[in-house]
């Protein structure tokens, strides 16, 4: 499980994002006949407390200018759409875990606002 452009002699797992590295670390904990399906939904420069909502369409997902996370915002709808599509693709696919990495774009907001908004998003994701 390595990115095709990774130089294994240098200990590289992947060259884009953290997904391949995380998947490689999870492999010892899953059955030998199972696999890991990555559903990337990240958006550079996104945040909960700042940014543009953008738009969403079922055909193309969140628009390029969507940079704000939150319940029912375009990035959230994109997350749900991608996750449901991955689960529907194969009846054996099961949602096992979500890895969330938040960047520094929420630095200007208050921790209380961020925690509340993230908690609401997690609750909604579990319900959807």
Predicted regions and their residues:
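Cell-envelope and extracellular/periplasmic
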Residues: 1-128
